[in-house]
Amino acid sequence: LRGRRGTPAVLGRFRYGREWESVTVKEVATVPLPQGGDPSWALVFPSDYGTGISNLGLHYVYYQLKRLGVGVERFFHSPIPNISVESHRPLQDFPIITASIAYEPDALNFLELLSLAGIPPRRKQRDTGAHPLIGAAGAFSSINPSMLLAIADFIVMGDGEPVIPFLVESLRKYSREVDREKLLKALDEHPSILVPGLGEEKALDTLARGEKRGAVTPAGQSVGHGIWVTPNSAFGDTLLLELQRGCMRGCPYCVLPACFSPLRQRPLEMVLDALDRCSSRVPFSQVGLVTPEAGDYPGLDVLLDRIESLGKGVSFASLRIDNLTPRMVKSLRDSGRESLTIAPETGSDSLRKCCGKPFTNGQILDKLEMARMEGMKKVKLYFMVGLPGETDEDVLAIASLAGAIRKGLHMGVSLSVNTFVPKPGTPWGNQPFVGIKEAERRYQCLKRAIAENLGKSFEARFSSPREADLEYRLSWAGPEAVDWMETLVEKRKRGKNNAI
């Protein structure tokens, strides 16, 4: 066994252990964390540490496993792959490995981690006696579990909290059995656990008949806040505070209504209590409100008042412009922010209405004028290109809207432009993907319009159509995708990241 760059495993464990310690020393737990012990369990978030430590799902699963006495340890794709955060053991030492896969590319990262650890990514190539049991969960496992059938022994669909006690009990009861099939049959009894380890065809048939459905955590039954606060998270020194799951909006491009319904809002009293308890226990500079749309949460103003009274700043995971109020803008300004982030999706009023956002460019300008009067100086706008029914005029309207904001309101403006990817289970799931070449053509049309109307130095970031194509392929892939996924992982390992 060798670590990175050929470092002997013992020395590598010491070296990378010290690196992890330099990261974890800045983690402050908001609740007491039990030691845990049995079984030994690798909890993998196949993305970078900053992203993973900002994911409330990872916090919740880790804490619940700890409370059940499980010896759970965290792994991330970077900066130190395949070495656990807690004890600095290699991934292959753990008999149980579960991955929380939030986004499509993370599935590739997980395959890469398994491969680097010497664990065959394909389930059929793993020896039940010599290799760990592999599970998958997370948002992507609910969006497209079919793609994971050739990889995972079992797949948890929906929220993890209602499933974990059953999962732990079953693993403790059957994990020492020589015949793993008894364990897999036990797991298959749960309505939210899909078990491809009993056969891919059976699992596909189960999905087609709708016999397995995502588990749902009732409002108020989750922890409701982050387990750690660390400056190394994607949000900085922030306490994550959950307000709701699911969404009432039903935008046709979004997976939330289809895969993560129903809407569940945490009672305001519970949210306030969690905030007060955490603020009395650990230091943090701001509160991150975790919700699909903060403006839909009842009692938001009361919560913002409480956050302000504690001397904390606030950040919103999402802001819908038609929900934006002076009170919300004031909270951002009082937190030291001068920039606002919104997602008009398109510059066309009619196309935006089709997207489930029936507000006009005029209403956007009115709301931003209010925000400017409240102290906001800049706005970042998110758009999609390749939407169903989109014309070149719709694409050019993005530049027109940006120009109207900058010239009419004298605000700083930046754009983030992404390629629309149809997702399974959504109303627009059956719409065609625009394709790499056409996305690039529309990007060029928009770039020319921006240069002509706003100047070549105007700040606009365009996501890669090639990456969107990969996301689309993974979103709709079946178990056969493991063939080209493995090929891509091997090319990545050889440094050929752009080869698909």
Where are these predicted regions, by residue range?
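Short secondary-structure boundary/capping segments
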Residues: 58-60, 114, 150-152, 171, ...
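Flexible loop/turn segments at secondary-structure boundaries
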Residues: 49-52, 63, 81-82, 105-107, ...
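Conserved SAM/AdoMet-binding glycine-rich loop
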Residues: 43-46, 96, 105, 273-414
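N-terminal [4Fe-4S]-dependent radical SAM core
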Residues: 14-42, 49-50, 194-240
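Radical SAM enzyme core and accessory elements
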Residues: 1-33, 41-43, 452-500
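Flexible glycine/acidic-rich beta-alpha junction loops that bind and position SAM and/or redox cofactors
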Residues: 298, 327-328, 350-355, 385-393, ...
